[in-house]
Amino acid sequence: MSMQFGSSTEFSNMCGVTLMNTPIGRVVAEVMGAKDGVELTEYPSMIRVDGQRLLDFDYEELTDALGQEFDGSIFEEISSTHYGRMVHLDEKTLLFASPEDAAEYIGFDLTAQ
């Protein structure tokens, strides 16, 4: 396990969230880690989920993997910090690296005034 610290002014095209390292958090991380462009970093009490461009936490997919209901309230319970634009919908939570990609969900006006 290595930790990287630092800052950069360039756009990273990354977004991510920290999940609690609990039985539910671990299953959610495993489902997300199986997706292309997603990297997991495990710590004793948390799991970082970092993705390129978009992270899509599909509640139906997570419900199937867990064998019990998963929804936005459970996502909020197992997550703490995040980076990127987070959008909660009835059926999923989305994290976008770019506000332009999230524009239709967050009311971000892309036209020049």
From Swiss-Prot:
User: Which Gene3D superfamilies does the entry link to?
Assistant: Monooxygenase component MmoB/DmpM
State the InterPro entries in the record. Answer: MOase_MmoB_DmpM (IPR003454), mOase_MmoB_DmpM_sf (IPR036889)
Q: Which domain of life is it from?
A: Bacteria
Molecular-function GO terms, alphabetical: monooxygenase activity
Q: What upregulates it?
A: By propane.
Q: What job does this protein perform?
A: Effector component of the propane 2-monooxygenase multicomponent enzyme system which is involved in the degradation of propane via the O2-dependent hydroxylation of propane.
Q: Which family does it belong to?
A: Belongs to the TmoD/XamoD family.
Q: How does it assemble?
A: The propane 2-monooxygenase multicomponent enzyme system is composed of an electron transfer component and a monooxygenase component interacting with the effector protein PrmD. The electron transfer component is composed of a reductase (PrmB), and the monooxygenase component is formed by a large subunit (PrmA) and a small subunit (PrmC).
Stated name of the protein:
Propane 2-monooxygenase, effector component
Q: Which organism is it from?
A: Rhodococcus jostii (strain RHA1)
